[in-house]
Amino acid sequence: MRPIAHRGCLTQYPENTLSAFRGSAPHVGMIETDVRRCGSGELVIFHDDTLDRVTDATGEVASTPMAVLEDVSVLGSGESIPRLTEVLEAVPEDVGLNLELKGRDVAAETVRVAAEYDHEVVVSSFYPDDVAAARDAGAETTAHLFYAEEPADFDVDRALDAAADLDCAYVHPDVDTCLETEVVEQARDRGFGVNAWTAETESEVLELR
């Protein structure tokens, strides 16, 4: 089992900041983060569509230029929103990166930029078209994210068929779906790696082993 720091371990650090990535990197095998495009075109690291929840600014990230994002403070930390390139430079190359695509136009550039570094990179998305775009752009490893509001209604076969059609190496089901369905066992039987999100308690981690 390999620990993955979700948004750089958001319970310990201001999420998706350089301090989060630097602080969590020595303790994990991979870091998960979110890539989207800002208003001036750069690829930046930020989870939400809007700035409101975790910064002292408001508005959509997609409409806000990098010059403004460089001056916002994430969760009162004094840290701003980093570029993708800054994260690739900050994270040691022996720590993998799971780059979740946010927005429908970032796959190809994300793959191209990440390829300039030597990290193990998994490019992931909830959206099949984005996974396919990453694969078409040359991503070596892709993953399809799964989330089920009602795990009892989750169609495991259909989900895994979709991941197979996309030539994914991994599937990323949410923890409840992992624990309440046979998705982990069936995915492994079909040759997929499985990265669950997001285990928040020791008991969940032990159940996922």
What are these regions (language model features)?
Residues 17, 80, 84, 110:
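Aromatic/hydrophobic pocket-lining residues that form the small-molecule binding cavity
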Residues 20-37, 87, 163-171:
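Catalytic domains of carbohydrate-active enzymes, especially glycoside hydrolases
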Residues 8, 12, 16:
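Entry/capping segment at the start of metal-dependent catalytic domains
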Residues 29, 35-90, 144-147:
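An active-site metal/cofactor-coordinating segment within enzyme catalytic domains
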Residues 27, 64, 72, 93-94, ...:
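Structured helix-beta-strand junction loops
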Residues 90, 100-209:
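Short loop-to-alpha-helix "cap/lid" segments that border enzyme active sites
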Residues 1-4:
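Extreme N-terminal starter segment of soluble prokaryotic enzymes
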Residues 23, 43-44, 206-209:
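C-terminal helical cap(s) of enzyme catalytic domains, especially alpha/beta-barrels
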